[in-house]
Amino acid sequence: MKSVRYLIGLFAFIACYYLLPISTRLLWQPDETRYAEISREMLASGDWIVPHLLGLRYFEKPIAGYWINSIGQWLFGANNFGVRAGVIFATLLTAALVTWFTLRLWRDKRLALLATVIYLSLFIVYAIGTYAVLDPFIAFWLVAGMCSFWLAMQAQTWKGKSAGFLLLGITCGMGVMTKGFLALAVPVLSVLPWVATQKRWKDLFIYGWLAVISCVLTVLPWGLAIAQREPDFWHYFFWVEHIQRFALDDAQHRAPFWYYLPVVIAGSLPWLGLLPGALYAGWKNRKHSATVYLLSWTIMPLLFFSVAKGKLPTYILSCFAPLAMLMAHYALLAAKNNPLALRINGWINIAFGVTGIIATFVVSPWGPMNTPVWQTFESYKVFCAWSIFSLWAFFGWYTLTNVEKTWPFAALCPLGLALLVGFSIPDRVMEGKHPQFFVEMTQESLQPSRYILTDSVGVAAGLAWSLQRDDIIMYRQTGELKYGLNYPDAKGRFVSGDEFANWLNQHRQEGIITLVLSVDRDEDINSLAIPPADVIDRQERLVLIQYRPK
């Protein structure tokens, strides 16, 4: 009966966090609008081999993540939930692997359930796992690969070992098809310390080639298909998207070595109080084979991405699966022996909630700031933000009432965030970061436009997805579409600032021409170097400028 209650509670938890509130949040640009539009175009064109964005070749990532996203929109429609359905599914599958692996290691159902809940409620997991990017997919394949490797190394027969390594190769292959060759480097780095300490080199060398073969066979069909269709894909993807992004001096998203320290700290909420103890207990118990495996799986990718020049918080998502297992194991031991860490965790959550309440007041219309984040007419959004932090502090306090039994309720600290964050985003943020909001405000003007031009790829993708058209033209800036725009068949998809006046004269009689520009909040739009317009509609950070036929 208790198991049934736990399962009902888990399903309610998943529904409240990962299902019910998702549609209330508009898509963020540039990431969510980009991936939403790529998948929409894939469904519309029927081309499941070559990814396109705004009708242009888009070679920043391979194809598998787009497949899953496209299936999500096919099943649930072109809406906010449909766009995010794929990442939510991947996150829940990863949580299922956390459950399975914890059971495999410790044979404890309660521990497995707690590890799952901890994983799903970690701030970084929830933030990325409900956000339409490709990282939850690669995290799933990496976690599946680590589970497969463990399965192979624990098998007692050659058939079991062979099956495990074949499965490892398939997961690595799917990882390559999702985000590239990092899906090969990360698992290898993660298992090497464990293989070395356990002296398991023999099994690795005997059966490892099976993983290589299955990985190649997994990638080969699509790899050959896209090489035939687009011979330049692999050169661009390997050199630009791997070498330049991570290793060269001009790498994208450059950050210092310590970049991931605050990411891990913030990402570990609402379980931050367990982080030091979980890692220390794991190190102290390093003679235990499974603990070494989890530690290596947590730390090695973190070190690898810290050394790389290009860094983003999403890169280390897969590290939090083993960390959640270590935290759950440590928390149960602490509850029995010394609940100090659990009390500290409760106080951290209270402090975080109270700090959030104070910060919300400071940036509210009633605070001391001259330019508040929310305007007076957005009072309900301020109260939503207060509710988010109040619930966080409340559940932090509740875990302290009987800490040995109530500590798992820390998983409910982000409940207010899950349910209310979509209602608390300030208009000034929505106007710049949510193209759907802009489209809703200017729908009547945008819909009949013969041509739409914009200077932001993220806004362009949002306009294309909302209006169901992929012919948005880039104006002044090419951004990440620079490579696709270099192809001969992309001629006419970019208009420079100097060329715009002539281009306008040539195309004005064909229909309404709409220019959507990103501007600074205090920028005078009358000073823009553009021909006089028939309509100007400013929505704070985005401005619609329209030219009608003469």
UniProtKB/Swiss-Prot annotation:
Where does this one sit in the cell?
A: Cell inner membrane
The yes or no answer to whether the keyword Secreted is present is no
Q: Name one GO molecular function term.
A: 4-amino-4-deoxy-L-arabinose transferase activity
| InterPro entries named in the record | ArnT_tfrase, Glyco_trans_39/83, LipidA_mod_glycosyltrf_83
Q: Name one GO biological process term.
A: protein O-linked glycosylation
Record's function text: Catalyzes the transfer of the L-Ara4N moiety of the glycolipid undecaprenyl phosphate-alpha-L-Ara4N to lipid A. The modified arabinose is attached to lipid A and is required for resistance to polymyxin and cationic antimicrobial peptides.
Q: What name appears for this protein in its UniProt entry? A: Undecaprenyl phosphate-alpha-4-amino-4-deoxy-L-arabinose arabinosyl transferase
According to its UniProt entry, this protein's organism is Escherichia coli O6:H1 (strain CFT073 / ATCC 700928 / UPEC)
